[in-house]
Amino acid sequence: MSVSRKRIDHCNDCANKNGSGWRIVNVKDVTYRKERCSDVFKHEPRCQCGCQDKHHDRHDPCVPDECSKTDKQLTIVSAVNPTSNLIIPEAGVLPVPVNNVILNGWTLTTPDLLNSFNPSTGIFTATESGDYEINLVLSFKSSAFLNATENLSNVPQVSIIDAATGLPLNEAIQGFPTTSSQVVVDVPVVPPIPVLVTVTSVLGVGQISLSIIISLSAGQQVEILVSSNGLSHIPSSFPVGPATFTFNTGTSLIVKKVRNIPKVIYSLC
C-alpha cells in the first residue's frame, strides 16, 4: 500500500458550464511541492487575460471577469445607509407588539453590474448557485432612552434572513448592545427605604457587525431584518409616543462571491 497525494479540484463559478463538479486527481510529488510553495499557482500557464486562475482552462472564452487573479472574492454589492426606521411602541399596550422592519432605501456605492440587489426593497438575489460572503455593519441611533429586561429577553435584534422563509441564515442573528448601571430607588414607605437597583438599557448609539459565508441557490433571496423583539418605550416627558431607531448613518452592506480554492489532501491507495 502506498500513500499518494490527491487534490480536490472544484470551481463553483464554472462547474455548471460543462456539467462537472468535484473531481479528484492524482498529483505528482513535483507538482505537489510546487503547489505547496507557490503563490496562487505560479507554475500554471497564464490564460489570455493574464490571470493565474487554476480553472481558467474551463472558461470559454477566458475573459477577465471570470478570472479571480490573486483575489478569490468578487464584490457584487456595496451599499450604505438605509432609510427605513424601527419603531419601538409605547409601553402600556398588552401584549407588547413586535415590530419588524426590512432595511430598505439603500444607496449603492459601486455599480451593481449583475443587477442582483434592489436598493429600494433591500432584497439581494443570488444570480447563480455558490458560496457568498455577506458583511453587514449596522450603525444605529435611538430617539429615546430604552430600558430592557435584566435577562435581555426583549433586546432588539438584527438578522440576515432568507426572504422566502423569514429564518436567519446560518444563525446570523445578533442582539443590540446593552449597558447596565445601578441606581438608588426609594421604596414608598414612611420613612422611605433606599434600595439599590440594577437598570439595563439598550445603547442609544452603537454598532453591530454580522458576517457569514453561506451557500445560496440561484434565485434565492436574502434581506436584512431588524426586530423590536418585544421592547417597549416608557416616555419620560410629553408628548408621549413611540421611540425610533434610525440606521441611515454609518451602516454598510457588502456581498461578495466566494471562489473555491483547490486543496491538497492525502489518501491511501
Curated annotation (Swiss-Prot):
Q: Mind telling me which SUPFAM superfamilies this protein's record contains?
A: TNF-like
Matching entries from InterPro entries are given as: Tumour_necrosis_fac-like_dom (IPR008983)
Protein name, entry field: Uncharacterized protein R623
Question: What is the source species?
Answer: Acanthamoeba polyphaga mimivirus (APMV)
